[in-house]
Amino acid sequence: MATPALSGQKVAVLPLTLAVPDLALSSDTLLSVRAKVLPWADSLVLEALTGRAPEVTWVGPRELRRAARRATGLATDPDHMGHALLRDPLLKVVPDPLRSQIRTLVALVDARYALVPASAVFLKEANGNVKVELKLVIVDARTGVPAWRSIAVGSATTPAMALRAALAAVLPVAGVQ
């Protein structure tokens, strides 16, 4: 991720709304429960962003929810905007009404860009490790154009370590894994 280009700016981080474990992981007590895995993944994403890219002011999902509640009738709940559709790599412009919902929410926190964790897929590898594929998109809220997208991939013995590895791959810090 080109965080130097975002240096000194606020970037809204939308909550993850699509996390899917494969069948081999469906019995996992964390990954199989949507109400648990989504806030857990959000916290790891925000932890990685603030720790690995402190030059950007990241406005996390909790702050976005609070801003949306304060602007009832104006802003949409960030957990129910349907932004998982941004996982489609062929999407060149964010369609309405999602585009206007992102623009409104981002404006409420005085930002221009939104980082959208579009989806997280957890897979069991043949060696027993967990592999995660996290699709991330940065959207320019003014134009509705995805400015950057990536699939962060990580593999480790636990889902948390795999997600951290994926985030480390997309947010590299020299000399640190």
Show which residues each predicted segment covers.
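A short, hydrophobic beta-strand-centered structural micro-motif
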Residues: 9-16, 93-125
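Acidic/histidine-rich, surface-exposed loop or edge segments in extracytoplasmic proteins
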Residues: 9-32, 85
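Bacterial Sec signal peptide processing site at the extreme N-terminus
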Residues: 1-7
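Amphipathic beta-strand/beta-sheet edge segments enriched in Tyr/Trp
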Residues: 119-156, 164
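N-terminal segment of the mature soluble domain
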Residues: 27-111
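Compositionally biased, intrinsically disordered linkers/stalks adjacent to structured regions
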Residues: 86-87, 94-98, 165-177
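Hydrophobic structural segments
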Residues: 21, 39-43, 151
